[in-house]
């Protein structure tokens, strides 16, 4: 996604977040419903197709209106009218990220050199509870980290891998070697 689209997605998602106000929990459930609906049906392809008229797109949304609050329907109509329908899934996903962030919920990815057992994953996630409520844990195996683990959440990384430890040792050794050379 280019920078312009990224800015548009963020702007629309923030607008929906602010409009939701005290109904944030309800809108969140409706957005989750919509995302599941769009991903399981050809509806999104229809809504984002440039040859489909705005009127037909609006009719498609109005057909599921009974499952959505008035504010969300209006938001989608504005999105369609502004010809941003191809960004709708990204906007709704970004909105959910904003909601999770506001409620201090985290999705984490744990990278390890080997497959971790459930008790190991539980220990890691329990030690990270201070960060917020962990709602989803993904596990990735990457033998290149040699040992330990790397945790990613949002834009943050906790690197407790053997590879990073060894890399730091190499860097420290190089610095000490330079100090010794400069002193001689």
Swiss-Prot record:
GO terms for molecular function: proton-transporting ATP synthase activity, rotational mechanism. One of its GO terms (cellular component) is proton-transporting ATP synthase complex. It is found in: Cell membrane. Keywords: ATP synthesis, Cell membrane, CF(1), Hydrogen ion transport, Ion transport, Membrane, Transport. InterPro entries: ATP_synth_OSCP/delta_N_sf (IPR026015), ATPase_OSCP/d_CS (IPR020781), ATPase_OSCP/dsu (IPR000711). It is a peripheral membrane protein. HAMAP family: ATP_synth_delta_bact. F(1)F(0) ATP synthase produces ATP from ADP in the presence of a proton or sodium gradient. F-type ATPases consist of two structural domains, F(1) containing the extramembraneous catalytic core and F(0) containing the membrane proton channel, linked together by a central stalk and a peripheral stalk. During catalysis, ATP synthesis in the catalytic domain of F(1) is coupled via a rotary mechanism of the central stalk subunits to proton translocation. This protein is part of the stalk that links CF(0) to CF(1). It either transmits conformational changes from CF(0) to CF(1) or is implicated in proton conduction. Belongs to the ATPase delta chain family. PANTHER family: ATP SYNTHASE DELTA CHAIN. F-type ATPases have 2 components, F(1) - the catalytic core - and F(0) - the membrane proton channel. F(1) has five subunits: alpha(3), beta(3), gamma(1), delta(1), epsilon(1). F(0) has three main subunits: a(1), b(2) and c(10-14). The alpha and beta chains form an alternating ring which encloses part of the gamma chain. F(1) is attached to F(0) by a central stalk formed by the gamma and epsilon chains, while a peripheral stalk is formed by the delta and b chains. This is ATP synthase subunit delta. It comes from Wolbachia pipientis subsp. Culex pipiens (strain wPip). The gene is atpH.
